[in-house]
UniProtKB/Swiss-Prot annotation:
It comes from Streptococcus pyogenes serotype M1. Zn(2+) binds at residues 81, 83, 97, 100. One of its GO terms (biological process) is DNA replication. GO terms for cellular component: nucleoid. Homotetramer. Interacts with both DnaA and DnaN, acting as a bridge between these two proteins. Involved in control of chromosome replication initiation. Inhibits the cooperative binding of DnaA to the oriC region, thus negatively regulating initiation of chromosome replication. Inhibits the ability of DnaA-ATP to form a helix on DNA; does not disassemble preformed DnaA-DNA helices. Decreases the residence time of DnaA on the chromosome at its binding sites (oriC, replication forks and promoter-binding sites). Tethers DnaA to the replication machinery via the DNA polymerase beta sliding clamp subunit (dnaN). The gene is yabA. Pfam families: YabA. It is found in: Cytoplasm, Nucleoid. Its main location: cytoplasm. InterPro entries: YabA. It comes from the Bacteria. This is Replication initiation control protein YabA. HAMAP family: YabA (MF_01159). Belongs to the YabA family.
Length: 107
């Protein structure tokens, strides 16, 4: 193997390493994004569990249908969907959801 072939082989190897490094950086960013999303979801889950525990321990004697509606209103006011389409998902920027509002406005 002469010097030119050796140099070309190293150059090709270097190019492959650069491509691999770029792919690894992209995967690293994706994993970081997933970890951040996972952390947010864990915090939301913890908050929902605390809220559920709090509601289960309340011993307020209310009309059962009124109590259910109040419970749904509380969840909605905390920024979560209560409609069948997106139940439990966080409302982005606490924007109104027409499906959730329809449920809350029922008599």
């Amino acid at each position: 193997m002469n010097k030119k072939e050796l140099f070309d082989a190293f150059d090709g190897f270097s190019q492959n390493l650069m491509v691999t490094l770029a792919e690894i950086e992209a995967m690293k960013k994706q994993v970081q994004s997933l970890v951040e999303e996972n952390t947010i979801l864990r915090l939301e889950n913890t908050k929902l569990r605390e809220r559920l525990s709090h509601l289960e321990h309340e011993t307020v004697a209310k009309n059962p249908s009124k109590q259910r509606k109040d419970h749904l209103e509380g969840i909605y006011d905390e920024g979560f969907h209560i409609c069948n389409f997106f139940y439990g998902q966080r409302r982005e920027n606490d924007e109104e959801c027409m499906f959730c509002r329809e449920l809350l406005d029922r008599k």
